[in-house]
Amino acid sequence: MKKIFTIAALSLPLFCHLPAMAGGQDDLKVKLMEINTLKANFNQTVTDINQKVIQTGEGVFALSHPNQFYWHLTAPDESLIVADGTDVWIYNPFAEEVSVMDINQAINASPIALLVHSDDATWSQYDVVNNGDCFDISPRDKDSGVSEVEVCFNQQQLTKMVLKDQQGNTSDFTLTNQTPIAENDKDLFKFIVPDDVDIDDQRLKSQN
């Protein structure tokens, strides 16, 4: 179950640097460029293909341009994902494990994570449809692990994100108590490896 949370979280940060493209992409870009930094609480509900709730969670979510992301699941089981602008750190306190990959590897692990980049060639692989206050984002590659992402706004606030995977699971995130990133919050994007944890450095593996 934690894998579902992790895949969903890796897909979240990444609505920040969408390039200008035709139609729905242009409209979504305007919305996203109004959000330079963001910190909020989130509540997450995961349902299966039969609409049965299989997990709930809550935590803290933060974004800052460029390519910085903080996702701290505080319940039911703690986990932490931090993107510091170059690397993505995934920490499981219960297992005492840390995985680290570079931004490009995170993109490969979760194709929707491509939203962190402003690369036009990359975004040509995705379709964006404007449905009023919400936007549907879907990969043209049907083998992608994430089949669709919906992001919703209330004027200039990002209020909701819904991720659907190929197994029929839906992760619904609702954001509350939103504020811009304060000066004392900037350290959220700096991950310090705890003592006595196992480190799976996938950056090194990718170079071999």
Swiss-Prot record:
From what organism does this protein derive?
Shewanella pealeana (strain ATCC 700345 / ANG-SQ1)
- Gene Ontology biological process: lipoprotein localization to outer membrane; lipoprotein transport
Q: State the oligomer form and interacting partners.
A: Monomer.
Query: GO CC terms for this protein?
Result: outer membrane-bounded periplasmic space
- What does the similarity note say? Belongs to the LolA family.
What PANTHER family does its record include?
OUTER-MEMBRANE LIPOPROTEIN CARRIER PROTEIN (PTHR35869:SF1)
Asked if Transmembrane is a keyword of the record, the answer is no
Q: Which UniProt keywords apply?
A: Chaperone, Periplasm, Protein transport, Signal, Transport
Write the gene name: lolA
Leader sequence range is 1-22
What subcellular compartments does it reside in? Answer: Periplasm
User: What's the short name of a Pfam family annotated to this entry?
Assistant: LolA
**Has UniProt tagged this entry with the keyword Transferase?**
no
Q: What name is this protein filed under?
A: Outer-membrane lipoprotein carrier protein
Function of the protein:
Participates in the translocation of lipoproteins from the inner membrane to the outer membrane. Only forms a complex with a lipoprotein if the residue after the N-terminal Cys is not an aspartate (The Asp acts as a targeting signal to indicate that the lipoprotein should stay in the inner membrane).
